[in-house]
């Protein structure tokens, strides 16, 4: 049986832009994409800490420090909002004991503070 498991997240990123007239997506600093092993056009869930909005979109590479919501998503976040960007993967149950997500922690300028591979939580059955 496969389970949907957190694959990677960028924790408490600060929204730097909202472009309603762009064709959808979220622009993310390429350094953050690399740290979390995100790929262009990957589906991500966005959790807005400021207002509780939760929605899905896809990733495109952005400029250094950039976290910009594009298209319809621009209505759900404002510059200055704090968000969590999460990606999930289907993992076979027998692989869960070895699976570890990428956890990317950033400061208020979206600079990487730390990247962790979660070893604290172990799957037990």
Curated annotation (Swiss-Prot):
Cofactor binding remark: Binds 1 pyruvoyl group covalently per subunit.
Cytoplasm keyword on record: yes
A Gene Ontology molecular function term of the record: aspartate 1-decarboxylase activity
Residue list for modification Pyruvic acid (Ser): 25
Organism phylogeny: Bacteria, Pseudomonadati, Aquificota, Aquificia, Aquificales
Assigned EC number: 4.1.1.11
Protein modification: Is synthesized initially as an inactive proenzyme, which is activated by self-cleavage at a specific serine bond to produce a beta-subunit with a hydroxyl group at its C-terminus and an alpha-subunit with a pyruvoyl group at its N-terminus.
Keywords on record: Autocatalytic cleavage, Cytoplasm, Decarboxylase, Lyase, Pantothenate biosynthesis, Pyruvate, Schiff base, Zymogen
Family in the record: Belongs to the PanD family.
Residues annotated as binding substrate: 57, 71-73
Name of this chain's protein: Aspartate 1-decarboxylase
Self-association state and partner proteins as the record states: Heterooctamer of four alpha and four beta subunits.
Main location: cytoplasm
Pathway given in the UniProt record: Cofactor biosynthesis; (R)-pantothenate biosynthesis; beta-alanine from L-aspartate: step 1/1
Recorded superkingdom: Bacteria
Species the sequence originates in: Hydrogenobaculum sp. (strain Y04AAS1)
Function as written in the Swiss-Prot or TrEMBL entry: Catalyzes the pyruvoyl-dependent decarboxylation of aspartate to produce beta-alanine.
Disulfide bonds: none
Active site: 25 (schiff-base intermediate with substrate), 58 (proton donor)
Entry's localization field: Cytoplasm
